[in-house]
Every structure is written in C-alpha cells, then in structure tokens.
C-alpha cells in the first residue's frame, strides 16, 4: 500500500506537566506531546500522518483582511476504505483529498461527516456529491448551511444524549461522533476515533497557544465553556487532540479553550 512510511514520526519531543484542571467527574491531564509528523503535498492540500490509520488534511484559503487561513480535517482509514471528517475550503481542494485517499492511501472515501456549517468545514460538499460520496451532518448544520450559502450534507445525523446513533453509527465506524453543545457555532460536533487515543475538536477547541477563540460571529458564547468541558469528558482517554486551526495538540488545548471561554 502506497502510504506514508509507517515511521511517520520524524522527531518527538515530550514535555510533561503535572498540574491538572479539576472539573466535576474529570481531571484534565496537561501532558503535552509535541511531535513533527511526516507530511506531503498533493495538489493544493498538505497531508500529515497522525497514526497508521489517521491522516490530517490541511487546506488554505486567502481570506480578505486575514490573509492565508489553514484548516484541518481528517481521513480515517478502515477496512480498505476511508471516512472523511470535514471537506477542504473548496470543491477543487476536496477533489485533491478524494484523489489522495484513492491513489496514495488506496482507501477510497466512502462517506464524509462535516462538523459545522462554515466554508472551511463543508465548502467541498459539491465535490462529494459529484463523486457519489454520502455526506452526513448535524440537523442544525444542514439548516444553517443555506444561510451560509453552502450546500447541505446529503444525510442528517441522529443524536441521543449527545452521541450520534442510528444508521450513521455503523456507516461511519470507527468514528464516535459527539455533539457537546454550542460553542464556536450552535451546531459544532466533535469526533473520537475508536481504538485510538485521538479525538477531533474541530473549531470548538483552540490550540494551547491561541490568544483568542477566533471567529465568534456565529458562536454560542453562553455555552462555550461548558461545551468544551463536555468534549473533554466525552473522550477522557484521548491525549492527541486534533483541531481545525492549529497543529496537533495535547489535552492542554481543552483546558486552555475552557479558560478562554470563561472570559467571554
């Protein structure tokens, strides 16, 4: 299989912090592992190997007044296929992702889930539709997509106590999809990967060195902190936290996001 080399980690430097942030029913470990991941560019998109079966895709769009903004999503490989978590900014970039999964990873994308109704997460839905790939989203995401001038996903997720249930549970395995409540947007969902220590906080969770919570134009400011806590509690064993706009993080990113949100 033409994957990135299994020795994907070029260098690892670990810095352990012993403090913890206490919350009801949980204690957040602040252990941070900073790693340099093997990466390669395919078309307009950069691909970084996080584990044998998880690849992070990074696409960039030049936004007026902001300059180039990078956005991360995932390709999760399972049983000879792959599942896409978030599209790129555009259809063209998303086609690069689909081609990479098929030609390089030899694991064509069968399904995709988008984590909220912003362009960096679902701007490539058109490419998925053209390729016949089933796309899934929170019901609020599909309703919000119209107001954001975005194409909605093809199917709607069903949730029970925060967790996605029903047909998507099998179709999107090994993803464990969790709605923590509103934060970055009212519809933001998060993703754990069963059998790993990896969770994706999307745009809800910020990097541990972030100065702000970023774009709050569609935010649920009142519930942001509690939703970030819910994410951490939902995936207590995850110590590799992937986020939309920073390199891979440790659990400190969750604590830092909560602290930023409590200042709102």
Model-derived segments and spans:
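Conserved beta-strand hairpin/beta-sheet module of binuclear metal-dependent hydrolase folds
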Residues: 49-98, 190-203
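Bacterial N-terminal signal peptides that target proteins for export
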Residues: 1-9
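C-terminal motif of bacterial Sec signal peptides marking the signal peptidase cleavage site
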Residues: 17-19
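Metallo-beta-lactamase
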Residues: 42, 49, 89-90, 127, 139-256, ...
